[in-house]
Amino acid sequence: MEFKRSDIEIMAPVGSYESLQAAIHAGADSVYFGVGQLNMRSRSAANFTLDDLARIVAIAREHGVKTYLAVNTLLYDEDLPAMRQTMDRAKAEGISAVIVSDQAGILYARSIGLEVHISTQLNLSNLESVAFYAQFADVMVLARELSIPQVRAIYDGIRERDIRGPHGELVRIEMFAHGALCMAISGKCYLSLHENGCSANRGACRQLCRRSYEVRDRDNGNELVIQNHYIMSPKDLCTVDFLDKFLGAGVRVLKIEGRARSAEYVKRVVECYDEALRALEAGTYTPEFAAGLKE
């Protein structure tokens, strides 16, 4: 399958103006970020405020970059006024789309004419779910747990069934291409809530899975021999060395995890994926080339 660089969107994470500038100058096509308490990194990463939205949009538009606002936590009744205020401001300031998982947020965004992208928190894992949410969204983040053949089957199904979003275009598949992975299905983890009373599903993950642990048999007290002590911490995702297969499965938006990361990290990762995409377009992408990008 042949690819044009312009067909693929690199979406970069930003938690500061430094990261925003780094993403833009590294070649990102879009950026995503959060404001306030209604996003999945509200307490574990830097966040902007509603008053920052106009400036963010202005900077991004100057460089032809789209802006996506994450409003993707679990919402309770007491959160709905803040959700509406956030989305009203996003609409007024010209945010390109909001990334949402709660149905209340999805419905409100659509009611005010704000474009919706379906968040990974909805764990979309099959074609029927994609077909259902197509009435609300043109872009959907599929579950990270899917295999490449499973993603390809959904992509083929979208085309065969002509599944289109509100703008009349075929639904586009977005997937995480790089960054940290959660030990729980699509981030639905309860460790922080159980241990610290802080819900990861409300943006307050305490990263307990990133700590080192000893594993002991409670019956005899023997410690189990494991490769490392980070028994609950998955290896970070990196698709640059099988990017051709990833795109061949139908992924058109490459999402980079890392709103808590530095501007230098954002710049380097975006540059790597931009370089890989240009190599794919030029026909110079090889395993050796990809391995060099990972170094």
Predicted segments with their positions:
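Acidic, glycine-enriched active-site microenvironments
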Residues: 140-141, 146
